[in-house]
């Protein structure tokens, strides 16, 4: 059964693609499964599936689907939060990069770090059984350390990890949390490729793992930005790769998309 909300998301995405990337052959989409898809759910509740959602959109939008659901399992998500864990996403990042014919960067110099203290996600204190706290880990490397992130809203530049934002909300460590439009520059890139990612909050932790394959990555969250506003702010280069990276939860709740 197709929800009205999914139809709304389809129309919203189609409007964006027609406005900015008419006729592009480089538009890709990955649908992020809901954590509930990997859990026992209460009787009578069936979470919307990533496969059906992707199939529906693939039939109606000019996109190539990159299926990442088979790469994910319950342990790839936080215990206390609906989001996925960045340190578990290397295979997802590699699969997406390869599907877009992007060079997969050398990750041999990666280091796994962790924020100090426990991570209490949005489920904390709201479940019948007490949950074990999470640790919020993040991946660093000389390549990621050299990347700069420009925030169009605040006209400021920082890194891919925002430790100040993380003090208030730990998951906002990744790209500073909810942001309408960011531009990541990778001075270590061995090419001039550009990637444009339309994403929700799940993209915050995955996009840094894709950035190494490109000179420039634009990160767009249309939940905070109307269509016409994007054209006033920046022009996207022709021939760029476009990735629609959305969770089932957002696609099935199109009211959040503008």
Labelled PLM ranges:
Residues 1-8, 12-13:
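Single conserved hydrophobic/aromatic residue that forms the stacking wall/gate
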Residues 9-10, 47-50, 82, 86-89, ...:
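Solvent-exposed, acidic/flexible segments
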Residues 36-37, 42-45, 52, 58-129:
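Catalytic His-Asp segment of secreted/periplasmic serine-dependent ester chemistry enzymes
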Residues 21-44, 246:
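Active-site segments of SGNH/GDSL-like serine hydrolases
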Residues 13-21, 206-210:
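Histidine-anchored nucleotide/phosphate-binding helix
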Residues 10-13, 53, 92, 206:
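Stable alpha-helical elements in mature extracytoplasmic
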């Amino acid at each position: 059964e197709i929800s009205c909300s999914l139809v709304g998301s389809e129309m919203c995405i189609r409007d964006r693609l027609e406005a900015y990337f008419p006729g592009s052959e480089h538009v890709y989409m990955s649908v992020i499964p809901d954590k509930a898809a990997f859990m026992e759910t209460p009787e009578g509740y069936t979470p919307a599936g990533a496969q059906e959602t992707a199939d529906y959109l693939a039939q109606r939008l000019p996109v190539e689907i990159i299926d990442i659901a088979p790469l994910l399992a319950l342990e790839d998500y936080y215990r206390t939060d609906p989001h996925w864990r960045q340190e578990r996403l290397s295979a997802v990042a590699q699969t997406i990069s390869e599907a877009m014919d992007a060079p997969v960067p050398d990750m041999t110099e990666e280091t796994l770090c962790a924020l100090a203290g426990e991570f209490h996600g949005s489920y904390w204190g709201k479940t019948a059984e007490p949950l074990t706290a999470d640790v919020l880990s993040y991946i660093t490397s000389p390549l990621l350390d050299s990347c700069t992130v420009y925030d169009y809203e605040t006209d400021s530049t920082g890194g891919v990890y925002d430790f100040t934002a993380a003090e208030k909300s730990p998951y906002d460590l990744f790209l500073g949390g909810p942001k309408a439009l960011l531009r990541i520059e990778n001075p270590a890139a061995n090419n001039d490729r550009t990637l444009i990612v339309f994403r929700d909050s799940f993209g915050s932790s995955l996009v840094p793992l894709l950035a190494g394959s490109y000179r420039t990555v634009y990160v767009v969250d249309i939940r905070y930005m109307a269509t016409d506003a994007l054209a006033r702010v920046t022009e996207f280069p022709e021939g760029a790769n476009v990735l629609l990276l959305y969770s089932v939860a957002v696609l099935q709740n199109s009211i959040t998309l503008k």
